[in-house]
């Protein structure tokens, strides 16, 4: 494990508002492209620190190693101190949801609002668990990323058989179409596996610290179904679980518009 004090994440500073928002993007993205809608709609309310997470964007060359909660807490602790940030809000989309949850767990006493958009980390898909948690399976997963034709062929067969949705198949094709993207997927799946959460305990911690959690899902999202976030949704007030009429790719934009209404 690297020395956290020597590890910094690149970030993009967006907006000019008085409130602070730490924002964590989805897989295969970077901070600025993911959170441009937040800058456009919320930039007058927030100064947004949109991070390039490990193995993504300007952080693509970071060493492949397991990211633990303690490691993440140390990195953010240093970031907050250097930038003189005391209180803040957080946002996480898709993969970035894991980092939003890890941030909430570590800094609940300094957070006011959490915006989770189709977040990873609420539950764990069996395929992810199989591919990332066991050494033999990780070896097979690594091989499949180095030799993608078989993997894509099986995915195509499942799509034609109606076992996976066409939009999910297109997403798989898009995120695996270059060796660099496949390496990013492998590094992220394997190295983020320690970011797991007891959702009931985390919600209790948020409630104790008066943190408001807003959970957004897309009605037409085929990548993250509502069942994947049911554990958290069941705990939230009805007006903080928001189902938007959109799919996965437009969810950040739609959520930004919804959040903007909170300031009116």
Q: Language model features by range: what are they?
A:
Residues 244-256:
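Catalytic histidine-centered segment of alpha/beta-hydrolase-like enzymes
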Residues 146-207:
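Conserved alpha/beta-hydrolase catalytic His-Asp/Glu region
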Residues 14-60:
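Conserved HGGG/HGGXW glycine-rich cap/lid loop of the alpha/beta-hydrolase fold
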Residues 105, 114-145:
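Flexible "cap/lid" loop of the alpha/beta hydrolase fold
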Residues 209, 215-217:
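Short beta-strand/loop motif that positions the catalytic acidic residue
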Residues 92-96, 100:
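Gly/Ala-rich beta-loop-alpha elbow adjacent to hydrolase catalytic centers
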Residues 222-228:
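Conserved alpha/beta-hydrolase "acid-adjacent" motif
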Residues 49-91:
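Active-site loop/oxyanion-hole signature of alpha/beta-hydrolase fold enzymes
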């Amino acid at each position: 494990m690297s020395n956290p004090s020597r590890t910094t994440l690149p970030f993009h500073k967006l907006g000019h508002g008085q409130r602070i928002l730490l924002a964590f993007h989805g897989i295969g993205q970077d901070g600025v492209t993911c959170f441009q809608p937040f800058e456009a709609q919320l930039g007058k309310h927030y100064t947004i620190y949109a991070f390039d997470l490990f193995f993504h964007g300007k952080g693509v060359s970071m060493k492949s190693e397991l990211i633990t909660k303690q490691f993440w807490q140390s990195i953010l602790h240093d970031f907050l101190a250097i930038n003189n940030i005391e209180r803040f809000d957080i946002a996480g989309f898709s993969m970035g949801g894991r980092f939003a949850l890890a941030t909430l767990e570590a800094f609940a006493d300094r957070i006011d609002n959490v915006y989770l958009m189709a977040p990873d980390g609420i539950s764990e898909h069996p395929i992810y668990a199989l591919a990332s948690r066991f050494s033999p399976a990780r070896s097979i997963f690594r091989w499949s990323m180095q030799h993608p034709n078989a993997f894509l062929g099986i995915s195509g067969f499942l799509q034609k058989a109606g076992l996976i949705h066409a939009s999910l198949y297109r997403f798989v094709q898009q995120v695996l179409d270059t060796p660099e993207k496949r390496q990013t997927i492998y590094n992220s799946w394997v190295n983020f596996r320690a970011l797991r959460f007891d959702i009931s305990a985390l919600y209790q911690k948020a409630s104790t610290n008066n943190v408001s959690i807003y959970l957004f899902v897309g009605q037409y999202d085929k990548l993250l179904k509502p069942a994947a976030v049911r554990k958290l949704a069941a705990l939230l007030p009805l007006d903080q679980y928001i189902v938007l009429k959109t799919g996965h790719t437009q969810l950040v934009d739609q959520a930004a518009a919804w959040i903007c209404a909170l300031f009116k």
